[in-house]
Amino acid sequence: LKYAHINKQLVEWQELVPTFTNFNQETGLFYSLWLEELTDYRSVDREYKRLIKNYANTTDIAPMGVVPPNVVNLSSIPWMHFEHFSSHQGAIKNNVTPMITSGKYEKVGSQLLMPVNIKVHHATVDGYHVSLFFEILQREMNR
C-alpha cells in the first residue's frame, strides 16, 4: 500500500498519511482532512476530534492546504451496510493510491459486522498484500 506513480517513476513511501473526508452538515458537502505523524490510537483519536471540530464549518474542499502525496484514502459510508463498493477513479491518470472504505456496522447474533472494502492497483499490490491487510485489521478489531 506504500507505492505511488509520480513523474513516470514508481515511488515507495516510508510512511503513509491517512486522508479522510468529513461532512459539512450545513452545506451537505464533503471536505478532505488528514492525520500526520501519529503513532498510537490515543493521539490519532485526539487529533481526529480536534480536526473535525476546527473544520466543521469549512466550505473549502481541502481546508488544511495541499494534500500530501503519500496518502492512503480512508472513506466511510456510515449510512449503509454494503457487500461491495466501488469508487471509480479512472479520471486520475496513473492513480495507484489505495482506498479503504468502511460502512455501517450491524449486529448479527452475537457478532458486530462492519463492511470494509479496499481498492488497490494490481501493479503495486497483490492479493497476498490485501490478505495481510485484512488479517491485521481483523486482529486489531478483535482487541
Name these PLM-found stretches.
Residues 63-84, 123-142:
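Short flexible/disordered coil segments
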Residues 1-18:
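Hydrophobic "lid/gating" helix adjacent to the active-site nucleophile
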Residues 16-23, 87:
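Short amphipathic alpha-helices and their capping loops
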Residues 1-4, 35, 42, 54, ...:
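Active-site-proximal acidic secondary-structure segment that organizes catalysis
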Residues 24-79:
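Helical lid/core segments from catalytic subdomains that handle acyl or acyl-like groups
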Residues 16, 29-31, 114-116:
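Short amphipathic alpha-helical segments
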Residues 62, 69-76, 80-113:
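Flexible, Gly/Pro-enriched loop and linker segments at secondary-structure and domain junctions
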